[in-house]
Amino acid sequence: MRSIAAPAAVAAALIIVTLCTGTAAQAQTADKPQTQSKPAAKPSAKPKPQAKPVAQPKQTAASQADSRPSICVASTIGRQFHVQTIGIMVFGNSLEKIPIDSWGVDDLAIRKIQDVVGRNYAVRRLPVSASALTLLEPKPFSGWTQDPMHDFVAAVAGSGPRCTTYMTVTPSGSQVDGTNQAVAGLGILVQGSPVVLIDRTRVFASFILRAFDGETFKPLHSEKPTTDPLLVNALTGGLSAMNRNVDKTWVPNPPQSAAQSAQLRNATRALVEEGVAKATRAILEGP
């Protein structure tokens, strides 16, 4: 019995060891991670976008102006406003000159020229020095000399590049009908009347536009704008200038207060704007 039981016990022990070993091996196999497949190849890099074509610079207003005919303008009408009275007798005459640079009349005149000629022309303002202004002052007759406007245009043109055309906007005298008096530039006029004993009051803008050749400064054309035709002025006692009738309450008192008057400023600017447009169109149309 003891000999049979011993081999049987040994066999049973071997079976148990075998079973345990197999179970452990299975467990180790399960614990091992499965072999990973090779990682997929990375997608090829995206093709670099083609460089955008360099945008051509747009033509600026300045470059456009370089290719256009140029009109250079010197305006001197916006410096003073006259408060003027013409009495029945010479002792009733008076004239006060008031600075009005703040009204911007010269800039207005040049903008209006640009409006009329359109974008086909490049218009720019020429500065006017004090020495150039003296060339416009009346001088005693000294024989046949060169037109003073030639010297004035040459002075304001300077030594820089020449313009195609030069234009000037300057005060011009206008005879007051029925008197030996005249007005010039911008102002308000009170005119005594011996017939009906009623004073006539007018705001006026008496000026002239002239055009000159850009190389020789030779005069090309000139226009003096008026509100009414010359024949109408002669028949009605009007002014050969831009003007409008106003109430006598418009007369500034004291005269120095004219520069602060909005109604005088606005009325004057309107006359200048209308007159410059008339004269510029006439110059463009030619003689």
Can you annotate each of these PLM segments?
Residues 180-185, 236:
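Outer-membrane beta-barrel translocator domains and adjoining extracellular loop/strand segments
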Residues 28-32, 46, 51-69, 77-79, ...:
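C-terminal/domain-edge helix-coil "capping" segments
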Residues 1-5:
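Positively charged n-region of N-terminal signal peptides that target proteins for export
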Residues 28-118:
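General N-terminal leader/first-domain-start detector
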